[in-house]
Amino acid sequence: MNFDLTKQQIELREKVRDFAEREVRPVASYNDENEVFDVELTRKMADLGLLGICVPKEYGGQELDTLSYIIAVEELSRVDGSTAATIAADNSLGISPIKEYGTKEQKEKYLPRLCKSHLWGF
């Protein structure tokens, strides 16, 4: 078996690492110390495609695999565990049950909104 990352996974890792250093690191300590949930940062993660990372494109997601999702969480965790937990919770607790078990109508109604940060599932 080949356990190397794909080119797409490597590019995602670099993109999320850059985002974490540029956007998350400067505010992480302040947000943590002041108990701030950074709405704007969460919207930026949605714009980057990190909410709904494994959701099919027809519902507004990135349609990436589970390893890509894990890579994104890991890269955010390097800088701030709370920020990583935000996308982990949204993808796993909010989005995944609808993606896996929702009716077509539920998927059409909720998944695009969850992927674009118009609705949160955490």
Region locations from a protein language model:
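Intrinsic disorder at enzyme termini
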Residues: 1-11
